[in-house]
Curated annotation (Swiss-Prot):
The keyword Cell membrane does not apply. Keywords: Bacterial flagellum biogenesis, Chaperone, Cytoplasm, Translation regulation. Its main location: cytoplasm. One of its GO terms (cellular component) is cytoplasm. The gene is fliW. It comes from the Bacteria. Disruption phenotype: Cells grow faster and are about 55% less motile in a swarming assay, flagellar filaments are severely shortened. Decreased levels of flagellins FlaA and FlaB but not FlaC accumulate; 3-fold more flaA and 4-fold less flaB mRNA accumulate in mid-log phase. In double csrA-fliW deletions, flagellin levels are slightly lower than wild-type. It comes from Campylobacter jejuni subsp. jejuni serotype O:6 (strain 81116 / NCTC 11828). Interacts with flagellins FlaA and FlaB but not with FlaC; recognizes glycosylated and non-glycosylated FlaA equally. Interacts with CsrA. May form a 3-way complex of flagellin, FliS and FliW simultaneously in which FliS and FliW do not directly interact. One of its GO terms (biological process) is regulation of translation. Acts as an anti-CsrA protein, binds CsrA and prevents it from repressing translation of its target genes, one of which is flagellin. Binds to flagellin and participates in the assembly of the flagellum. Overexpression leads to increased levels of FlaA and FlaB, but levels of FlaC remain stable. Involved in post-transcriptional regulation of flagellin biosynthesis. This is Flagellar assembly factor FliW. The lineage of its organism: Bacteria, Pseudomonadati, Campylobacterota, Epsilonproteobacteria, Campylobacterales. InterPro entries: Flagellar_assembly_factor_FliW, Flagellar_assmbl_FliW_dom_sf. It holds the Pfam family FliW. It is found in: Cytoplasm.
């Protein structure tokens, strides 16, 4: 599915369209469709951190045309390491997707309001052994 990027992704401001695809039951991929060939691996945060919660600022809600009835998904970018346990998740910049109109944004959260969220939080912190 092709998603329209409604607000620039940090470091990838020229990207306006991305291809969304499922990797497996845990991970998905966003691949750039605009010039530069890059992709992100994302994770559904609720699979590893069920208490993950944040408010989507009104600005982003308007960009996505979100309503309480919207079919919305939230993912977080994963930095893949040699092992899954060493891989990190960016909980400070979730990707919000409105499946009703195929739009997406990366929401940048304020560390003052979300002191327990980090840019590079190891997945090992959330995997039960």
């Amino acid at each position: 599915m092709t998603l329209a990027v409604k607000c620039p992704i940090l470091g990838f401001e020229e990207t306006k369209n991305m291809e969304f695809s499922t990797i497996d039951e845990v991970f998905v991929r966003l691949k750039s469709l605009d010039g530069k060939d890059f992709s992100f691996v994302l994770i559904n945060p609720y699979l590893i951190r069920p208490d993950y919660e944040f408010d989507i600022p009104t600005y982003y809600q308007e960009l996505l045309s979100l309503t309480p009835e919207s079919n919305m998904k939230i993912f977080n970018i994963v930095a893949i390491a040699k092992s899954i346990e060493e891989s990190t998740v960016n909980f400070l910049a979730p990707v919000v997707i409105n499946l009703d109109n195929n739009t997406m944004v990366q929401v940048i959260l304020d560390t003052v309001n979300y002191p327990d969220f980090f840019q590079a939080d190891q997945i090992a912190n959330y995997i039960k052994k």
